[in-house]
């Protein structure tokens, strides 16, 4: 059984300076994970494009400096020492749809930069968001589909599978996700148990569990018996099993309050309990 925790699960600790990518690796090892699902927010020194204007993001930006390569080598070495390979690198800020062609071009270059980073870490999967809005217009659809068609071959050259996630924008609607997946052979889905439009979650689960190549089993709140009180995680896992899911049981723990590490620990225990497996 493969088990992972997205590093976004520790974003509050990251924001206060109490966490970094090396602590994430250590925490995953302590929690008994078998792979690392890194969120690019945990690589702040590589994430400087927010301060750049779109016109300043030229193709050269996709290339990594000697210092950046050395930093990634350190991260990979730490992961190797912990016996943890990288799984899916979740990328924010390189989504495909923007109103402005200039912004689309800038995001394409950012995506190429993250392809290079994922390849350096040895990650087999990368999440690039669709963007857009839930009311996906034909123009949005065309831009998103064209963007994924353009991205997939470049990712494949680096041994990477591209995943979209039901995350935000157009991808919160099951009909949009299905339409995009059908239009882009080879595009995978990172299935998040949350994020769907509230009135479309059942349809989202039915779709997502059949297309999932990776998961974010999203947990928020636990009772004293260790049960998630807001989302039926056991049901989602059974649906995935019934659909023949073979990937890592990926967790995204987002506790509404309290200790992020303890919430992650409870999430891991819940997954083991559902599967009938013993924690490492």
Named regions from a protein language model:
Residues 1-34, 149, 156-157, 170-280:
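Histidine-acidic metal/acid-base catalytic patches
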Residues 7, 36-41, 88-93:
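Short, conserved active-site loops that position catalytic residues or coordinate cofactors/metal ions
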Residues 12-14, 44-47, 95-100, 132-138, ...:
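A short acidic, helix-capping loop that chelates divalent metal ions and anchors anionic groups
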Residues 37-75, 130-136:
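Glycine-rich, proline-tolerant flexible connector loops at the mouths of alpha/beta enzymes
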Residues 39, 92, 129, 218, ...:
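Conserved residues at the C-terminal ends of beta-strands
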Residues 40-42, 165-167, 254:
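A short gly/proline-enriched turn/hairpin at secondary-structure junctions
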Residues 65-188, 198, 261-262, 278-279:
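Active-site acidic/histidine proton-transfer and metal-coordination neighborhood
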């Amino acid at each position: 059984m493969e088990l992972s925790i997205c590093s976004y699960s520790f974003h509050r600790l990251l924001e206060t300076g109490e966490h970094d990518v090396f602590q994430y690796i250590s925490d995953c090892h302590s929690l008994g994970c078998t792979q690392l699902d890194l969120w690019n927010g945990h690589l702040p020194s590589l994430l400087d494009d927010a301060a750049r204007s779109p016109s300043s993001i030229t193709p050269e930006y996709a290339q990594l400096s000697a210092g950046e390569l050395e930093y990634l080598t350190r991260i990979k070495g730490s992961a190797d020492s912990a016996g943890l390979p990288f799984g899916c690198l979740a990328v924010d800020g390189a989504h495909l749809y923007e109103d402005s062609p200039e912004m689309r071009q800038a995001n394409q270059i950012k995506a190429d930069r993250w392809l290079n980073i994922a390849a350096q870490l040895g990650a087999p999967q990368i999440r690039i968001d669709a963007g857009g809005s839930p009311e996906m217009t034909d123009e949005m659809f065309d831009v998103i589909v064209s963007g994924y068609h353009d991205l997939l071959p470049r990712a494949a050259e680096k041994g990477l599978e591209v995943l979209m996630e039901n995350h935000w924008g157009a991808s919160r609607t099951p009909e949009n996700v299905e339409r995009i997946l059908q239009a882009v052979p080879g595009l995978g889905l990172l299935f998040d148990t949350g994020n769907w439009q509230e009135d479309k979650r059942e349809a989202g689960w039915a779709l997502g569990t059949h297309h999932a190549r990776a998961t974010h089993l999203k947990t928020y709140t636990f009772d004293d018996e260790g049960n998630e009180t807001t989302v039926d995680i056991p049901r989602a896992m059974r649906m995935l099993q019934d659909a023949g899911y073979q990937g890592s049981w990926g967790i995204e723990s987002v506790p509404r309050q309290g200790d992020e590490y303890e919430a992650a620990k409870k999430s891991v225990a819940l997954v083991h309990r559902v599967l009938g497996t013993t924690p490492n």
